[in-house]
Every structure is written in C-alpha cells, then in structure tokens.
From Swiss-Prot:
Pfam families: PLDc_2. It comes from Helicobacter pylori (strain ATCC 700392 / 26695). It is a single-pass membrane protein. Gene3D superfamilies: Endonuclease Chain A. It comes from the Bacteria. The chain crosses the membrane at residues 1-21. It is found in: Cell membrane. This is Uncharacterized protein HP_0190. GO terms for cellular component: plasma membrane. Keywords: Cell membrane, Membrane, Repeat, Transferase, Transmembrane, Transmembrane helix. Its main location: membrane. One of its GO terms (molecular function) is phosphatidyltransferase activity. Belongs to the phospholipase D family. Cardiolipin synthase subfamily.
Length: 502
C-alpha cells in the first residue's frame, strides 16, 4: 500500500504537470504551387476551369485504399502530411513507413501527427522516422506515462483531458491530393488481417478541398497539445534505436514473390492513375473539421451541424452508415419527423457480435427498437460478412468501421464522424460534404450491398427480431445473433455507464 501511495504522489506532482508547457515551434511548411507538382499537373486544367470544384475518386476496397496511399507517396514531390488516430505496427503500417522514408530520402518533407491512444508503442517503426532530417513526428495529447500497462492511473487522475482524442484522418500529398474517410493505418483497415477486417470507405480528393484540409492540419500541428517526439520521456531510448531506420526495408515480413506482386500492383495503379482510368467525380466539396481547441474547451461540432442541416433538408431518402450509433433524443425527434414526411431512412451499424465496443452497443440498443417501430430500415452487420477470401486467407470476422451518409442521392458526408456523443462533443473529427449525384449513388449502392448481406431488424408479432437470407432461406433470430449469454450480460451491465461519456 505504501508503494502504491508513493507512486501516486510522484504521479500527481510530477506526471500530471509533465506535459503542461509550450511546445516549440517546428519548421514552417514549404511554399509552392501545388498545380505544378506531378499529381497537381494531371488535374490542373480541369480544376482551374471551376475553382469552386474538387475532383474525387471513391476508395471502397481496402487493399485498393492501401495502393492509393503507396502510389501517392511514390508520386509525391514536395510534401506529405499525415494525421491519424491509429497507426499500428503491422505489415501495412511498415510498408507505408518504408514508403515515407523513401520519399524523405529524395527530398520530400514529411510530417506525421498521431493520436497517442492509437500508437502501438513508442518504439514503433513510424516513431523512428522522426530521426530523418526530412521527417517530423508529433504525438497529439500524449500520456505522460509511456508504459501502456500503467496508463489507467493517469486516466483516473486526468480523465477530462485523457478522454478527448484526435479522431481525424487526413493523408495530404503535395497540398493537392487528400484522402479523407474512416480508415486508420493498419492491416484490418486494408483487408489484410486474419482475425478482423473493417468495412470502411474513404475518398481521394483533389483541388480546393485539399488546401482546406491542409489549413486544418496546420492548426493541429501547431496546437500546444501536439508534442514532438523529442519531448517524450522515452526519447533517449528511442534515439538509441535510430540506426534501425536504415533497416526498415529488411524488417517487412514479406516473401520475394509477394513483394514482386505488390510492386506490380503499385505500378499498375500509378499507370492507371496517370491515364485517368479511375472513375472521377467533380463537384463542390466542403471540408469540415473541429478546431483542436475542442480538446480544451467545449465547442460546437461543424460536422454535426452540417449533418443535422442536411438531414432536415432531405426530400426523399437518407442512408446512414456509422460504426457507432447513439443518436440521442434530439436527433430521434428529427428522424421521427422526417419519416412522418415519407422520407426513407436507412441505418447500417454494427451488431453485438461485430462491434468492437460492447458499451456503445448497449447505448445503441436504447434507440434501436424505437427506430424500427418508427419505420426506419435498420441493419446490423453480420460478423461473418461476405466471408470473403483475402490474399488466399479467410478472415474470421468483419466489423463496420465506416462513417458515411448519403442524402437524396445528391450529397455525401464522408469522414471520421460517428453518430454518437463522442464524435459530437468529445473527440475532434474531420469530414467532407460532397455534392455530386453520381458519387452519391455509387456510395449508396455500396452501402445497400452491405445492408443486403446484414441482419435486417423487423417487427414480428409485436417484437423486434433479426432476419437475414442464408443460402436462399429466410432465417430469424429473437436475440442478438452469434452472441453468448455472457456477452449479452456484459452488454446489459454496460447500460449503467453515462451515454455522453461513451
């Protein structure tokens, strides 16, 4: 007990104040005309015809999303800015780290901003990149305690700060191209995980929306809670491993055959990209992002405001895909009002068996049956979704991670924003509202395809049940499918937690 009290006293009087200082100003971003870069020159003529428009390529497939990131890095000439919530130290992440290193070696300036919650370890490959002269790495809102196993003490002592995370996801290349959506960096976001793969969606945008995303990145990069790796307590130990940066190419666990196949796919992507062979959509794109100051003080979410406005203005249909769905009473009233007007409301979210957050599902359950009885089409992902084969291997589980909304087959809201209190009031988020009917229809068809292979919740004999088609036969479940009694019990216990804190 005495040792525990000593630890707490050291933590309170040292740890709690360990990161309250002014972060040194890092180097200023280089200035250049993005339209003169190799990527920018491809679309300069078309986009300059209408400066208010942006171009977009939809990234539905996970592996294709990885190819786009790697290909863009290889085509980069001036700068790369990456902002993400999670960066895992696995195969996909190591591939991207290696590509960023190669880009830096040829003079590209690279800046990487990671949320501390999503960092596997201070000794991940991505952290080693900070020792390259052309690469800077910062950690957003970091824990003072660097040992993950001991962080619960800091969470208890500094909960109000620690609970607020940077959930934004941006991948900006040469200030002209930006990937925005739900994907973090890790194997299960790129269909390369044996255990669980995330169903997700993002898009590659060119033009004006990229410059707005860049402005947002700058605000976060210079925010006082974005801490350089050099100021972390583990920096000295990390510096001892700096020599490992030269061995990144050797560390990637991939066979020569797989490497050759991957190289061919990347080269094929670059060739198709430069020949405009990917479907490209043009339209007005509005970039939306929270201020990083939301971490320190309550602020209205511009994404939530835009979502509610588009929802109220919908005339025909709304299709919402959100991995976490806790709408709250105010939004439920909006849903009810729109359904009463004849608007078709479709909702796709995780089931209890597919979710990675049981407590969130417990909160969602409070609204689920109400929405079904209101007349909404509610779908929950089956954890064996697609049962698809990935690179010769079967992943055992699928979970929805996307955050995408389509309004009237015209507007699409795409980004990191879930329909829940955490996205609205606690975390920081980023998204794009894109006005293009063809793009919206393509996204809706993708979501509809997901829904058709999911559980459909319907009212049967006055109760809500789950139904799905399996091998041409309609099947029904009266309790959460593919779950144990113990899992359902945990879900029930979780309902004592305050909804606003989830």
């Amino acid at each position: 007990m005495k040792i525990f009290l000593v630890f707490l006293s050291v933590f309170f009087f040292n740890g709690c104040f360990g990161l309250v200082y002014k972060t040194p100003i890092s180097s200023s971003p280089i200035s250049y005309d993005p339209y003169t870069t190799p990527i920018g020159s491809l679309y300069a003529e078309k986009l300059k015809e209408n400066p208010n428009h942006s171009a977009a390529i939809l990234l539905e497939d996970g592996f294709d999303a990885l190819l786009h990131r790697v290909g863009l890095i290889r085509m980069s000439q001036k700068s790369i800015d990456m902002q993400t919530y999670i960066y895992k130290n696995d195969l996909s992440s190591q591939v991207i780290a290696k590509e960023l290193l190669n880009a830096a070696n040829r003079g590209v300036k690279v800046r990487i901003l990671l949320d501390d919650n999503g960092l596997d370890s201070d000794f991940s490959d991505i952290m080693l990149l900070n020792f390259h002269k052309n690469i800077e790495v910062k950690i957003f809102n970091p824990y003072y305690i660097r040992n993950k196993g001991l962080r619960y003490f800091e969470m208890l002592a500094d909960y109000e700060r620690i609970k607020k995370r940077m959930h934004n996801k941006l991948f900006i290349v040469d200030n002209f191209a930006v990937i925005i959506g739900g994907r973090n960096i890790g194997d299960n976001y790129f269909d390369n995980d044996l255990d669980t793969n995330f169903l997700d969606l993002d898009a590659l945008f060119f033009g004006g929306v990229a410059s707005k995303a860049k402005e947002s990145f700058e605000r976060y990069w210079r925010f006082h809670r974005s801490i350089p790796v050099s100021l972390l307590r583990t920096h000295k130990r990390l510096k001892n491993n700096a020599k490992e940066i030269a061995k990144l190419h050797e560390k990637i666990p991939i066979s020569a055959e797989d490497k050759n196949q991957f190289e061919k796919k990347v080269n094929d992507f670059i060739d198709r990209f430069q020949k405009y062979q990917y479907p490209i959509y043009y339209g007005n794109a509005i970039f939306l992002a929270d201020s990083p100051k939301k971490i320190d003080t309550p602020l209205y979410s511009p994404i939530k405001i835009a979502f509610e406005k588009a929802l109220k203005n919908a005339k025909d249909s709304v299709f919402i895909a959100s991995s976490y769905f806790i709408p709250g009473k105010k939004m439920m009233k909006i849903f009810k009002n729109q359904i009463s007007k004849g608007i078709e409301l479709n909702i796709l979210t995780n089931s209890l068996s597919s979710t990675d957050a049981i407590v969130v599902y417990g909160a969602w359950e409070r609204y689920r049956n109400q929405l079904v009885r209101m007349g909404a089409n509610v779908y929950e992902i089956r954890n064996d979704f697609f049962n698809r084969q990935i690179k010769g291997r079967f992943s055992t589980k699928h979970s929805l991670h996307g955050k995408t909304i389509v309004f009237d087959d015209n507007l699409t809201l795409l980004g990191s924003f879930n329909i829940d209190p955490r996205s609205a009031y606690i975390n920081t988020e980023s998204a794009v509202l894109f006005d293009n009917p063809s793009f919206a229809k393509r996204v809706r068809l993708s979501l509809k395809d997901h829904a058709q292979q999911s559980w459909h919740l319907v009212v049967y004999r006055h109760r809500v049940i789950w139904e799905a088609v399996e091998e041409g036969i309609l099947i029904h479940e009266k309790t959460s499918p593919d779950t144990s009694f113990f899992l359902r019990l945990i879900k029930e216990w979780s309902k004592v937690l305050p909804e606003r804190e989830l």
